[in-house]
């Protein structure tokens, strides 16, 4: 029985500069990682080397990220290429096809979890996300304190508009998930439903816990917490990071760990920004998967320091 969570490194940091999946995973193993997450930038050409490395035991795969591998002809990360919230049947069919393919691949590499995005609400005119973005660009800290009354009024108005439009998108997302539950269960894969960073992405953070807890106990799903995304949403005034984690703790599967800089850039090295990782670590459990999801811009030292800082909190 494990006494500490698994700590993995995501290929988000390095897949772009590799042509051979074996060499990529060998590099990650040489940094001291027993486990790796195969992220949403895995090109088809990397797959043979990945399978060889997994078969030889170079690393183990803790999780993968939809879509993995990428659809044929797509050569860069594209997790929102097809969305489960879209009602147009051709895109829906593509989402379903490539999600099932990702489930197959996750099972093939013996991953436990496939991390998934749940779509978004689209606006043809008067997108409320634009008003939020513009205000925060000029008043960077307006969302954190709750003291900016003009921003609070804008936020309330924008949320009302978002909720008014979101129903068909959210209903489609739930229907899409229902289409893959049995398939994922048959393959032994749990779907990690990830919190997102954009204003109009689904589900709304305030609804996440009720949605997941309201699913059938047999549904192969759980909550996947991204620290950077939660911090960005906290900066918008949409959640309190600790309270959000506490509400979703009963169905937590794992974490994407990365920091956010003073200018709002995420996927930074752990401890380099303002996220309270000591607070986050209070929610870690031995059965959880912890994944460092770092930007390709991070240096080798950034990766090593992030690993050491997480291990010190475990």
Language-model segments: residues:
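Short catalytic-loop micro-motif centered on adjacent basic/acidic residues
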Residues: 34-40, 192-194, 291-293
